[in-house]
Amino acid sequence: LVVNTGDNLSDQQAVPDTLRALGPLLARPGLFVFGTNDYWAPQPVNPFKYLLGKKREPSYVDLPWRGMRAAFLEHGWRDANQARHEFKVGNVRLAVAGVDDPHHDLDDYSEIAGPPNEDADLSLALLHAPEPRVLEKFAADGYQLSLSGHTHGGQICLPGSRALVTNCGIDRDRVQGLHD
């Protein structure tokens, strides 16, 4: 199972290169949610500005996310943006729910709220940015595992992978790895 947590694009011509890079992964069952850099082009930023804790506005230079979405769907991947899915991968029954990027308030948890199917072997929560206000709702609904991206293992790190900032609401010790 391939789980894509977003921020795939950086340029208006990037879809073919993105699909080429994903290559053989597209033949596997997959799920995706989008990050801001699927919708709008990234902009240069001094990463030390993250230390100020201010959220910056996206560029609002549109990226071709619809074409990427269509290609993902054509390859059989499931769009988990504001959606729930139930399916099997091999013999494993999955219950999946996802939201659009909460870092820029594109999520609407009410559209997917509620516990996962109890018959599922594994329940997955997907979101681009691991914002606590959304993670807490997934946990309260009983999802077993949440997968997200956005933090890049810490936007600025000291040696030993010690993050100085996360660029989201989670604490610095949780920017990478597996956590209970």
Regions found by a protein language model. Give the residues of each.
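Core catalytic region of metal-dependent phosphoesterases/phosphodiesterases
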Residues: 1-88
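Conserved acidic residues
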Residues: 2, 28, 121-123, 144
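Short, conserved loop/helix-junction motifs that constitute active-site signature segments
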Residues: 22-27, 116-119, 138-142
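Conserved beta-sheet core of the metallophosphoesterase superfamily
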Residues: 130-180
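Glycine-enriched alpha-helix->loop->beta-strand junction motifs that scaffold or abut catalytic
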Residues: 76, 93, 142-146
